[in-house]
Structures are given as structure tokens and as C-alpha cells.
A protein has these predicted regions:
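Flexible, acidic glycine-rich loops studded with aromatic residues
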Residues: 116-121, 128-132, 138-285
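Gly/Pro-rich turn-and-neighbor structural signature
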Residues: 50-53, 57-135, 140-147
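Short, solvent-exposed S/T- and G/P-enriched segments that are highly enriched in secreted/extracellular
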Residues: 301-317
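Aromatic- and acidic-residue-enriched carbohydrate-binding clefts of CAZyme catalytic domains
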Residues: 5-46, 74-99
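Short, exposed coil/turn segments at beta-strand boundaries within extracellular/luminal domains
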Residues: 326-334
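Disordered, acidic Ser/Thr/Pro-rich linker "stalks" and the adjacent N-terminal cap
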Residues: 334-389
């Protein structure tokens, strides 16, 4: 549930909830991609009263999270009805429209005996009631701001606690918030981040997050990918949430490896830290410090060979190494020459124009998503030009 933005799905069923202006459908191949509820349309609140009323009856929790993040307020700026509402209320900032919308949501929830949970953007102005429970996801600063304004806050900044983020640059997962492993999770410290004693009184706790759409393409009928992404990061999260990290990483790492047997007994497909790999004088030397066994793969073969000593080769780009311990496994680690072959230099051109927000250099640098300016039509093309044959 996310209001008033992120609502394209319900808008496709109830297009009348959108703002009152003709959308740009040329660049979207005929689709209306507007995703925000019109704040000025009174009928919208009747629909939401019905939806949230049923939701509140289903769930016994004190809080119902109603969202509030990533609202495309340009839609409100273009809507004559929303602009008229702002004028009547003496508003100049569209964030005040979100305040108004969320106040209506809070009233609906209160009528059903519930309190609202919201993302940190919903309290940008500080205008919402302190009855709201804030989930600070955008950054540590967002959590600092919310607690300073007096909001009870669940601290969950993406760069530390979004477990759908990849753990090294070569692994699977998102990377828009950060690339991090359990060591960085353990390194989060409220004092170092600048939380005062007064702000700490507004911290409800820490929370880890994994968004399910990141799971759909990874055999969701099996827990392997979810386990790998969450464990042992979730162990480090629990540790700092309950006891802090004053003893330092080295001491905790020894404690963490004791959890391996527990996780294996529970059938958890956890992630091991990658082994340390060096290639010198024509041979690979590999070390693992957690008692796990080391294996290597050569070329395209899926066969794993047990590492028993230095591996001699004049073709280091063909080798990958990993470790295993019961149900746990590490990511693959390779020589830098291997990654050069996976990320060959390339230039991207197309007939569809380049998005300014997601330029082609994101893709050509292997650092993120790139988009065209419009959808594909007949005779359109995308060309990848490599500096060297691949």
C-alpha cells in the first residue's frame, strides 16, 4: 500500500482518481503513466475510506502503513483542481498537498481504531501529527530529520539495511542505495551518525528490508536467493539493534561464524564472506579464514574442483573461486582480468533518444539502468559498439 503516489495499478482500474489534465502519452507509447491520486478530488476519499476500512478490519495491528514516498508532485502542479485547492488554502509548496492528503488518511485510520505508518518523505514539512510512525528509508539524514521533528521513527536507511542491495559489485541485487555486506551493517552506530539523546528517545528501533519484486526472478518457490541476501546481514542487524557494536568487528566476526552451524541446522542458504584471492608469478593463492572449504571453476565448466594448494596457470581470466560450508556459500571471486572480460568497453547509441535521468553511460559503465527517451516503434534500433571484439 502506498499513497498518494505509486498508485499506477489502481489508476489503471479507476482512472478517475488521477489529476484533471490530459496526460502525455506520446513518449509512453500510448499509456497513461500518471501514478498519483488527485488530492482535490473528494470522491477519492470515499473510495479510500472503503478500501482502508476493509483493510483495517483484516489486520489487528495498531499501525497501518499508508506510504507517502516518491510522489510525482509535478502531476499536482499541472492539475487545475489541485492548484485551485492550494490557492484556497494559501499553500505555495506541493508538499503541503501531501500533508493534506495524509491527514485525511490518518482520519480514516483513526475512525477504524488505527494509527498511520508513513515513509519519511511524508513528514518533510513536519506538518503531520506526531501520531504518525515514520519509517526512515532514504538516508541516515532522513532519520535524523524525522527524530529531530519529534516523530517516532523506525530507522532503516537503505545504505545499511536494504537487503535487496548487492553485497559486492559483481553479485546480484540492486545497487541504487549502496553495495554492502554484513560488515557494513554491523558498522552502523547511532552516536557516530549524530543522534542526540533526545533523538534517540524517538527511535523505535532498527529494521531490515527486502522488497519482494527483487525475488520474483530468482526462483521464488525456493528460499535460496532470499536466504543468501538476508543472512548473515540480518544477524548483524539483530546484534547491533539489541547490543550495539562497541566491541568492534573482529570480535563480532568470531561470534558471527558461530552462527553458521545454527543457520545450517535451520536449512538457511546463507552467504559466506568471499575468500581472499591473489595471483602472482603465474599462480593463484586463496585463503578462507572461517573454516570453509575452497573450490574453483575453470572456464565455462560448471564443475567445482577442491582447492588444495596454489593453482598454476597462465590464463588467470578463466578462473573463479568460492567457498562452501554446509548450507552456506560465498560469491565467486576472480582475478581482475576476469572482470575485464565481463565488462568490455562499449558505446551505446539508439534511434529512440537518451533519457537525461538514466543516460546510456549508466549501462556502458556497468553501473546502473539506462533508458531511452520513448518507447520502441517499428524500425527503431539500439547499437552496442565494442572497442574490441567480444
Amino acid at each position: 500500500i502506498d499513497l498518494p503516489g505509486h498508485s499506477r495499478n489502481i489508476a489503471s482500474v479507476h482512472p478517475e482518481i488521477r489529476c484533471n489534465y490530459p496526460p502525455d502519452t506520446v513518449s509512453t507509447n500510448g499509456y497513461d503513466y500518471r501514478s498519483a491520486w488527485c488530492v482535490a478530488r473528494e470522491e477519492n476519499y470515499a473510495l479510500l475510506t472503503d478500501i482502508l476500512g476493509e483493510l483495517c478490519a483484516l489486520f489487528p495491528s495498531e499501525y497501518i502503513h499508508v506510504g507517502g514516498d516518491e510522489v510525482d508532485m509535478t502531476q499536482w502542479n499541472r492539475c487545475p483542481d489541485c492548484q485551485a485547492l492550494m490557492s484556497r488554502r494559501g499553500m505555495t509548496d506541493p508538499h503541503r498537498l501531501e500533508d493534506l492528503f495524509m491527514e485525511r488518511m490518518a482520519a480514516i485510520l483513526a475512525a477504524n481504531g488505527k494509527r498511520p505508518g508513513v515513509w519519511n518523505e511524508a513528514v518533510t514539512t513536519g506538518g503531520l501529527s506526531r501520531e504518525c510512525l515514520v519509517y526512515g528509508w532514504q538516508s541516515v539524514k532522513a532519520c535524523l530529520d524525522a527524530t529531530a521533528k519529534g516523530y517516532k521513527t523506525v530507522v532503516m536507511p537503505g545504505e545499511y539495511f536494504y537487503f535487496d542491495m548487492r553485497q559486492t559489485p559483481q553479485e546480484e541485487g540492486h545497487d541504487w542505495a549502496a553495495v554492502f555486506d554484513a560488515k557494513k551493517v554491523f558498522g552502523f552506530d547511532f552516536t557516530e551518525k549524530g543522534f542526540s539523546d533526545e533523538q534517540m528517545r524517538n527511535v523505535v528501533g532498527l529494521q531490515g528490508t527486502f522488497f519482494s519484486e527483487a525475488y520474483v526472478s530468482h526462483e521464488p518457490e525456493k528460499p535460496d536467493y532470499l536466504d543468501y541476501m538476508c543472512f548473515p546481514r540480518i544477524c548483524a542487524l539483530a546484534r547491533i539493534a539489541w547490543r550495539g557494536n562497541c566491541e568492534g568487528w573482529d570480535a563480532y566476526y568470531r561470534e558471527l561464524t558461530d552462527h553458521y552451524d545454527r543457520m545450517a541446522a535451520m536449512g538457511i542458504r546463507f552467504r559466506l564472506f568471499p575468500p581472499k584471492v591473489s595471483y602472482k608469478e603465474g599462480a593463484f593463492t586463496v585463503v578462507a579464514d572461517d573454516g570453509s572449504e575452497i573450490f574453483y571453476l575453470e572456464g565455462d565448466s560448471p564443475e567445482e574442483h577442491r582447492y588444495t594448494g596454489p593453482v598454476k596457470t597462465e590464463k588467470p581470466h578463466l578462473y573463479r573461486f568460492l567457498t562452501r560450508y554446509k548450507t552456506g556459500r560465498s560469491p565467486y571471486v576472480a582475478d581482475k582480468s576476469y572482470y575485464r572480460t565481463l565488462a568490455p568497453a562499449v558505446t551505446i547509441t539508439t534511434s529512440m533518444g537518451e533519457s537525461t535521468q538514466f543516460p546510456y553511460t549508466n549501462a556502458s559503465a556497468y553501473k546502473g539502468l539506462a533508458r531511452t527517451r520513448r518507447a520502441c516503434r517499428q524500425q527503431d534500433w539500439i547499437l552496442y559498439t565494442y572497442e574490441q571484439p567480444v
